[in-house]
From Swiss-Prot:
Family membership noted in the UniProt record: Belongs to the venom metalloproteinase (M12B) family. P-II subfamily. P-IIa sub-subfamily.
Disulfide bonds: 6-21, 8-16, 15-38, 29-35, 34-59, 47-66
Protein name: Disintegrin halysin
Organism: Gloydius blomhoffii
Assembly and oligomerization: Monomer.
Amino acid sequence: EAGEECDCGSPGNPCCDAATCKLRQGAQCAEGLCCDQCRFMKKGTVCRIARGDDMDDYCNGISAGCPRNPF
């Protein structure tokens, strides 16, 4: 929702302050295929394994989402 940096529905999330819906100090992310222990995973880390004729998808190092490869 507007103004929220993370999903504050789970008070047990170590990356997100459940009272403010903001990332805790030092956290880059709270969830996502490219988020590990509140930090973005390194660029080039496989986040989605290829299926069929598709290719693997990789983290970009600057977001928690797993961008789809353009091929």
